[in-house]
Amino acid sequence: MTLKKVDANPSTLESSLQELKSDETSRSKINFILFLADNDPTTGQSWCPDCVRAEPVIYKTLEEFPEEVKLIRAYAGDRPTWRTPAHPWRVDSRFKLTGVPTLVRWDGDSVKGRLEDHQAHLPHLILPLLAPST
């Protein structure tokens, strides 16, 4: 049906999450956060090969879902920024990221499902995240 994408970074993710929480229409939608590596300015592609592989699969799977899906694309930064052990999303108890891409189903204020970097490119694993949450 419809995939609505919103971009965020470490300094804007909280405001994007607050918008989701306060938006009455978003509460009834399926919401995801896709944590990604930034694009390399010299190539125009992500510096992360797993992100390059997973992004089109994730977008296609979510776009084909019959209900509206909202996706926050959360860009973690360039390679040195992401590799920092103190990266905000590595130490945030809600996310505890260890790799990118990471796809999470976000309901309310918490993660209701996730696919790590080695799983995020597999449609048969993405589809269960679209199931109604309980």
UniProtKB/Swiss-Prot annotation:
CC per GO annotation: cytosol; plastid
Alphabetized GO MF terms: protein-disulfide reductase [NAD(P)H] activity
Pfam families cross-referenced by the UniProt entry: TXD17-like_Trx (PF06110)
Disulphide bond pairs: C48-C51
Domain of life: Eukaryota
Domain Thioredoxin per the UniProt entry, residue ranges: 1-134
Catalytic residues, chain numbering: C48 (nucleophile), C51 (nucleophile)
Keyword entries, A-Z: Disulfide bond, Electron transport, Redox-active center, Transport
InterPro entries hit by this protein: Thioredoxin-like_sf, TXNDC17-like, TXNDC17_dom
Family named by the database record: Belongs to the thioredoxin family.
Functional summary from the UniProt entry: Probable thiol-disulfide oxidoreductase that may participate in various redox reactions.
Name used for this protein in its record: Thioredoxin-like protein Clot
Naturally occurring in which organism (per UniProt): Arabidopsis thaliana
